UniProtKB/Swiss-Prot annotation:
UniProt xrefs under HAMAP family: DXP_synth
Biological processes annotated in GO: 1-deoxy-D-xylulose 5-phosphate biosynthetic process; isopentenyl diphosphate biosynthetic process, methylerythritol 4-phosphate pathway; terpenoid biosynthetic process; thiamine biosynthetic process
Originating species: Escherichia fergusonii (strain ATCC 35469 / DSM 13698 / CCUG 18766 / IAM 14443 / JCM 21226 / LMG 7866 / NBRC 102419 / NCTC 12128 / CDC 0568-73)
Gene: dxs
Protein family (similarity comment): Belongs to the transketolase family. DXPS subfamily.
Cofactor notes: Binds 1 Mg(2+) ion per subunit.
Binding site for thiamine diphosphate: H80, G121, H122, S123, G153, A154, N181, Y288, E370
Summary of the function given for this chain in its UniProt record: Catalyzes the acyloin condensation reaction between C atoms 2 and 3 of pyruvate and glyceraldehyde 3-phosphate to yield 1-deoxy-D-xylulose-5-phosphate (DXP).
Enzyme Commission code(s) on record: 2.2.1.7
Record note on quaternary structure: Homodimer.
Protein name: 1-deoxy-D-xylulose-5-phosphate synthase
Length: 620
């Protein structure tokens, strides 16, 4: 989409923070209105994360207006809310390409812009990185400032509190901005807090506060009285006690949609020493009523008509694998009162909405706390229940020690339903499910299953749920199932694959949902096709049978080749001294960028044509 200067006359003057800082303050509310409309126009045409960015327009403008970015370093947590930041930092005309192959990255990305200080995608990393950056800036000695912006969801994670605890100890000069869009702010309380925030962040108050502490530092009763008086003044209107106890100077909450008020407060706080904490209240989806009413639905959107206020309805085609999981979960819970389901803030994405409504006493959303989710499941298992952890592949990485130490070593029957395994598409490097087979395969006592279709997925979930000798995992992809018939549930024999097609010379050992493409290749090359089903334990007898009756083996998986299922096949053959040529097909040794799943599979040679070409080139 070409930029319409007539439609956005103020935004047309701003293609960088330097140009932003040339504008008079009085024009900034108009700039915010235009920026919000441009974001709506752009994302509705291209798709992308939507509601979060609408809520951070004023904050983004205020931060770049007050701070000398990129010299001063601005760090965004997660990055869903950073679209306005991208628009104001030289990427305005490319915002329509965001999340597309070869387009702007969906999150702040160091390789894309000098204004993107930290590459992000996973939550709760900003404060830890910000402390390191602030310490480095202090040693540099050039008065470079550090600001971290974190949301009310991300700040609930343990890593954020670990970082704040450390900041309170070493006291770097930095600002943490909490973008809180969970609660509404009433006009009266908001006005009082805005006034108080500007007072408490001002130089006079700060000087009196620090000077008073120095004067009375040797008089404990008076020092304690001053501290309590300050706390009572703040406590009348602010909920910042926790952050003060962690060692931060807390200001807020303030109206995050008052751009001029934010600028005043940020200017006052800019030169304060030590860790500062600014709590702002915003509304997710601000300025677009449908998104304000339903920010979860409008969190990430496909292309849509903004005048309709509705997102396009699903075509009613095949169910997603997440839906297959959710249906199985409800079906099983209705029969077994011991079932408990856990998710780290992924209710909608993991297909658990219906379960949460039907079985609220057995549904646990632990927020963005993957480590806690896994060890909580371990505790439930110890207590005699049957926990299921529904989690994205990329987020399970954050709880690796808990899987190993708290579940596997104790042989606890926890079932991991691993969604978004393999290539996920538009969210790029930080969200691809490329590594779960590699990092789980080396854990003793773990059973790992890779369904080739939705019926296999149900059978494997059932098998894992009834496996009581240790943990199990079923990994399945983002996207729709393939349309096979669903058969009655029954336990699969652990560690056994099945031959789907008999051929000659070549045997293709497939792990997972690339099976339809693998079947095309097998047909074209007249190869034997095996659905291996289990990555751990591997069907060693079947592998050795295939090695004995074929000239070469091909392994196929949508996981990193290094350490993946194919590596396991290689290990079996070497352990039995079978010098059979093996070609491992899977994800290469680099972080997979954004693009649709179809685009990336084609580029990586994981569609039928690409696999066949790789095999023919290898055999030549």
């Amino acid at each position: 989409m070409s930029f319409d200067i007539a439609k956005y006359p103020t935004l047309a003057l701003v293609d960088s923070p330097q140009e932003l800082r040339l504008l008079p303050k009085e024009s900034l509310p108009k700039l915010c209105d235009e920026l919000r409309r441009y974001l709506l126009d752009s994302v509705s045409r291209s798709s992308g994360h939507f509601a979060s960015g609408l809520g951070t327009v004023e904050l983004t403008v205020a931060l770049h207006y007050v701070y000398n970015t990129p010299f001063d370093q601005l760090i965004w947590d997660v990055g869903h809310q950073a679209y306005p930041h991208k628009i104001l930092t030289g990427r305005r005309d490319k915002i329509g390409t965001i999340r597309q192959k070869g387009g702007l990255h969906p999150f702040p990305w160091r390789g894309e812009s000098e204004y993107d200080v930290l590459s992000v995608g996973h939550s709760s990393t900003s404060i830890s990185a910000g402390i390191g950056i602030a310490v480095a800036a202090e040693k540099e000695g050039k008065n470079r400032r550090t600001v971290c912006v974190i949301g009310d969801g991300a700040i609930t994670a343990g890593m954020a509190f670990e970082a704040m605890n450390h900041a309170g100890d070493i006291r770097p000069d930095m600002l943490v901005v909490l973008n809180d869009n969970e609660m509404s702010i009433s006009e009266n309380v908001g006005a009082l807090n805005n006034h108080l925030a500007q007072l408490l962040s001002g130089k006079l108050y700060s000087s009196l506060r620090e000077g008073g502490k120095k004067v009375f530092s040797g008089v404990p009763p008076i020092k304690e009285l001053l501290k309590r008086t300050e706390e009572h003044i703040k406590g009348m209107v602010v909920p910042g006690t926790l952050f003060e106890e962690l060692g931060f100077n807390y200001i807020g909450p303030v109206d995050g949609h008052d751009v001029l008020g934010l600028i005043t407060t940020l200017k006052n706080m800019r030169d304060l020493k030590g860790p500062q904490f600014l709590h702002i209240m915003t509304k997710k989806g601000r300025g677009y009523e449908p998104a304000e009413k339903d920010p979860i639905t409008f969190h990430a959107v496909p292309k849509f008509d903004p005048s309709s206020g509705c997102l396009p309805k699903s075509s009613g085609g095949l169910p997603s694998y997440s839906k297959i999981f959710g249906d199985w979960l409800c079906e099983t819970a209705a029969k077994d009162s011991k079932l408990m389901a856990i998710t780290p803030a992924m209710r909608e994405g993991s297909g658990m909405v219906e379960f949460s409504r039907k079985f609220p006493d057995r549904y646990f959303d632990v927020a963005i706390a993957e480590q806690h989710a896994v060890t909580f499941a371990a505790g439930l298992a110890i207590g005699g229940y049957k926990p299921i952890v529904a989690i994205y592949s990329t987020f399970l990485q954050r709880a690796y020690d808990q899987v190993l130490h708290d579940v596997a070593i104790q042989k606890l029957p926890v079932l991991f339903a691993i969604d978004r395994a393999g290539i996920v598409g538009a969210d790029g490097q930080t969200h691809q499910g490329a590594f779960d087979l590699s990092y789980l395969r080396c854990i003793p006592e773990m059973v790992i299953m890779t369904p080739s279709d939705e019926n296999e997925c149900r059978q494997m979930l059932y098998t894992g749920y009834h496996y009581n000798d240790g943990p199990s995992a079923v990994r399945y992809p983002r996207g729709n199932a393939v349309g096979v018939e669903l058969t009655p549930l029954e336990k699969l024999p652990i560690g056994k694959g099945i031959v789907k097609r008999r051929g000659e010379k070549l045997a293709i050992l497939n792990f997972g949902t690339l099976m339809p493409e693998a079947a095309k290749v097998a047909e074209s090359l007249n190869a034997t096709l095996v659905d291996m089903r289990f990555v751990k334990p591997l069907d060693e007898a079947l592998i050795l049978e295939m090695a004995a009756s074929h000239e070469a083996l091909i392994t196929i998986e949508e996981n990193a080749i290094m350490g993946g299922a194919g590596s396991g096949v290689n290990e079996v053959l070497m352990a039995h001294r079978k010098p059979v040529p093996v070609l491992n097909i899977g994800l290469p040794d680099f972080f997979i960028p954004q693009g649709t799943q179809e685009e990336m599979r084609a580029e990586l040679g994981l569609d039928a044509a690409g696999m066949e070409a790789k095999i023919k080139a290898w055999l030549a």
